[in-house]
């Protein structure tokens, strides 16, 4: 019996403000992973400017793909599939990656696979260790906060999601109100390490048994706290405000994740998304799940938490194995829903 041939997938990611390309072997092993960040270009605006993001993607896309091949020491003849982020994201940014992937697929006759950005974040964990099912993913990013139950590869059931602001969005808005530089999340995380949780802030548990999240009330409470202090001529230590805000967010995230993991009897909990780089959240989850027998916690390294193309290649490998193929009329879909792979085969 002959050995199964290794599968090499080229991943392309341009959903927001990182232009990325990567080559991944068998959905698990990173051969190359190249990311061109735009943070410096967006800093002075206090957030991502879609038009600027698109222009940077146009400038960088060919370069990062070429660099991914150079670092891997490979050519297009070695590639079995091209996986690209189809959505969600900024439509102009998505189109750069999708059009590049379609052009390469056509030029080199390589199968094309569209990938959901959040599926990519979840599958970043497979680049660390095998996913054991049933699994629960806590997805925390600038645009998403979700609890996703997975009974098998490519199966996604959203059991909880934010009703308003995503956790990362709340971090950025609070940081902006505090006068912290962009991106605000890492700044709050650093300050929180030095501060005390001594400012009373709300925690939105919502209705009993709910796995949904809400951070708009917390965000407003922080803004009101700062405004009231300013009106009274008082100063609030940014370290203490950061610690109080961050603990309010983490408390809800960790408590609901632990409760869902128990109720759904999962074997593994996966942390995913840009906010997964938050040291306070990582430490709180590690402390919580050290007490849960039979559940392993997987946290990707920092470089795989933020947007990258290795995670897109990893998710694309699973989609490809399930028979999913993208057509040349593929488009960027800014509002793409996270749907199980088996219902997408086309």
Swiss-Prot record:
Name of the top EC class for this enzyme: transferase
Reported cofactor(s): Fe(2+)
Entries under SUPFAM superfamilies matching the protein: Actin-like ATPase domain (SSF53067)
Keywords per UniProt: Acyltransferase, Cytoplasm, Iron, Metal-binding, Transferase, tRNA processing
Manner of cofactor binding, per the entry note: Binds 1 Fe(2+) ion per subunit.
PROSITE patterns hit by this protein: GLYCOPROTEASE
Enzyme Commission number(s): 2.3.1.234
Lineage: superkingdom: Bacteria
Classification via Gene3D superfamilies: 3.30.420.40
Binding-site residues for substrate, renumbered to this chain: 139-143, 172, 185, 189, 278
One Pfam family in the UniProt entry: TsaD
GO cellular-component term (any): cytoplasm
Compartments where located: Cytoplasm
Molecular function terms, GO-annotated: iron ion binding; N(6)-L-threonylcarbamoyladenine synthase activity
Predominant subcellular localization, coarse grouping: cytoplasm
GO biological process: tRNA threonylcarbamoyladenosine modification
Recorded catalytic activity of this chain's protein: L-threonylcarbamoyladenylate + adenosine(37) in tRNA = N(6)-L-threonylcarbamoyladenosine(37) in tRNA + AMP + H(+)
Binding site for Fe cation: 117, 121, 307
Misc. remarks from the entry: The four proteins YwlC, TsaD, TsaB and TsaE are necessary and sufficient for tRNA(NNU) t(6)A37 threonylcarbamoyladenosine biosynthesis in vitro in B.subtilis.
Protein family according to the UniProt entry: Belongs to the KAE1 / TsaD family.
Oligomer status and interactors: May form a heterodimer with TsaB.
Function: Required for the formation of a threonylcarbamoyl group on adenosine at position 37 (t(6)A37) in tRNAs that read codons beginning with adenine. Is involved in the transfer of the threonylcarbamoyl moiety of threonylcarbamoyl-AMP (TC-AMP) to the N6 group of A37, together with TsaE and TsaB; this reaction does not require ATP in vitro. TsaD likely plays a direct catalytic role in this reaction.
Protein name per Swiss-Prot or TrEMBL: tRNA N6-adenosine threonylcarbamoyltransferase
Organism: Bacillus subtilis (strain 168)
């Amino acid at each position: 019996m002959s050995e199964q041939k290794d599968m090499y997938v080229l991943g392309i990611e341009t959903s927001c403000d990182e232009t990325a390309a990567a080559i991944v072997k068998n959905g698990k092993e990173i051969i190359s992973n190249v990311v061109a960040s735009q943070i410096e270009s967006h800093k002075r605006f206090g957030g991502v400017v879609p038009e600027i993001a698109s222009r940077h993607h146009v400038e960088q896309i060919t370069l990062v793909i070429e660099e991914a091949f150079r670092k891997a020491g490979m050519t297009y003849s070695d590639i079995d599939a091209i996986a690209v982020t189809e959505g969600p994201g900024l439509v102009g940014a998505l189109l750069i990656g999708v059009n590049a992937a379609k052009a390469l697929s056509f030029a080199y006759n390589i199968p094309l696979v569209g990938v959901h950005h959040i599926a990519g974040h979840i599958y970043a964990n497979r680049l660390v260790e095998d996913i054991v099912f049933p699994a629960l993913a806590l997805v925390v990013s600038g645009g998403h906060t979700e609890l996703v139950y997975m009974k098998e590869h490519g199966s996604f059931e959203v059991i909880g999601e934010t009703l308003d602001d995503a956790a990362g969005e709340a971090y950025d808005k609070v940081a902006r109100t505090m006068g912290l530089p962009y991106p605000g999340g890492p700044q709050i995380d650093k300050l929180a390490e030095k501060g005390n949780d001594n400012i009373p802030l709300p925690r939105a548990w919502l209705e009993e048994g709910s796995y949904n999240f809400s951070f708009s009330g917390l965000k407003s409470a922080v803004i009101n706290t700062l405004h009231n202090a300013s009106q009274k001529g008082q100063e609030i230590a940014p370290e203490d405000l950061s610690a109080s805000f961050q603990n309010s967010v983490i408390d809800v995230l960790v408590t609901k994740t632990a409760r869902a993991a128990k109720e759904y009897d999962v074997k593994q909990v996966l942390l995913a998304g840009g906010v997964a780089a938050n040291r306070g959240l990582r430490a709180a989850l590690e402390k919580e799940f050290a007490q849960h027998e039979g559940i392993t916690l997987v946290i990707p390294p920092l470089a795989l938490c933020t947007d990258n193309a290795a995670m897109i290649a990893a998710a694309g490998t699973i989609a490809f194995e399930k028979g999913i193929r993208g057509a040349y009329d593929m488009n960027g879909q800014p509002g793409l829903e996270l749907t199980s792979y088996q219902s997408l085969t086309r």
